[in-house]
């Protein structure tokens, strides 16, 4: 993933958390905020998920899913993807379909707040 499509500062994450709208499914929470800077995506994996190895593994998988399916994401949105604990048992294909499901759910609502 290119650095221009990542949320990087703590400040940017805070804006998305405070002003964004949250969408859920069984495996992910997705916080979405309308942005004027183009589509940017960040990942947040809590310590409840497991040790650093497990947290980094899920982030690597999610980054790859986003990279390969970037055209599926709505333009002009800042998004924070938060995987839930039960995602550690899913295969790559199941992760991909679950993430795209919650993204479609968010884009159907037009992510307005």
UniProtKB/Swiss-Prot annotation:
GO CC, sorted alphabetically, is: ribonuclease P complex
Short name of one Pfam family for this protein?
Ribonuclease_P
Q: Which reaction does it catalyse?
A: Endonucleolytic cleavage of RNA, removing 5'-extranucleotides from tRNA precursor
Q: Name one GO molecular function term.
A: ribonuclease P activity
The question of whether tRNA processing is a record keyword is answered with yes
Question: Which SUPFAM superfamilies does the entry link to?
Answer: Ribosomal protein S5 domain 2-like
Q: Which GO terms describe its biological process?
A: tRNA 5'-leader removal
Q: Per its UniProt record, what InterPro entries does this chain match?
A: Ribosomal_Su5_D2-typ_SF (IPR020568), Ribsml_uS5_D2-typ_fold_subgr (IPR014721), RNase_P (IPR000100), RNase_P_CS (IPR020539)
The record's note on quaternary structure and interaction partners says: Consists of a catalytic RNA component (M1 or rnpB) and a protein subunit.
Name the job this protein performs.
RNaseP catalyzes the removal of the 5'-leader sequence from pre-tRNA to produce the mature 5'-terminus. It can also cleave other RNA substrates such as 4.5S RNA. The protein component plays an auxiliary but essential role in vivo by binding to the 5'-leader sequence and broadening the substrate specificity of the ribozyme.
Give the record's family classification: Belongs to the RnpA family.
What name appears for this protein in its UniProt entry? Ribonuclease P protein component
